[in-house]
A protein has these predicted regions:
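N-terminal intrinsically disordered, cationic/polar leader segments
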Residues: 1-150
């Protein structure tokens, strides 16, 4: 099966883990006499959108860590299409979403991966914001009181 790279591919209209495509690292390593003892590919995913059970849209940023000594990696366009298809499935929690991504990518590339949540959500503040709506001060031509100097 050929991957989606370089081809026009319709955006999935349902959850589509089958769109994931592996890339063998053998071609890049062949005749290079490389030995991998450590290293990792890190994929930062800045736009992961998903729905919870109440159909509330959530946004997270995740980081996928694939060991450099894995036999396969995931083709980037197929990963992007897969991630976009997540919006068609409901998840109980971020943990369930991460577990789902992890399971499908690990099955594809035949190795264990690590996924981190790299998005730090801002806590809502209970402080009141006071807005001054007094616009009575109109600067005169030679009035420099409204000029900020650095």
């Amino acid at each position: 099966m050929a991957g989606p790279l370089g081809k026009k591919v319709a955006i999935p209209d349902s959850f589509s883990p089958e769109i994931l495509f592996p890339i063998s690292r053998d071609n890049q390593r062949k005749d290079k006499d490389l030995i991998f003892k450590k290293g990792v590919d890190i994929w930062n995913l800045h736009e992961v959108f998903w729905l919870d059970q109440d159909s509330v849209t959530n946004h997270d940023e995740l980081s996928i860590h694939i060991p450099a000594d894995s036999k396969f990696t995931v083709e980037s366009k197929s990963l992007k299409l897969f991630l976009n298809s997540l919006i068609h499935k409901r998840f109980e929690s971020l943990k369930e979403l991460i577990d789902t991504i992890k399971r499908h990518v690990e099955n594809l590339i035949e190795t264990s991966i690590k996924i981190d949540d790299i998005y730090q959500k801002q806590e809502l503040s209970s402080k009141k914001i006071i807005v001054n709506s007094d616009f009575s001060h109109t600067p005169k031509v030679n009035d420099h009181s409204s000029i900020t100097r650095f």
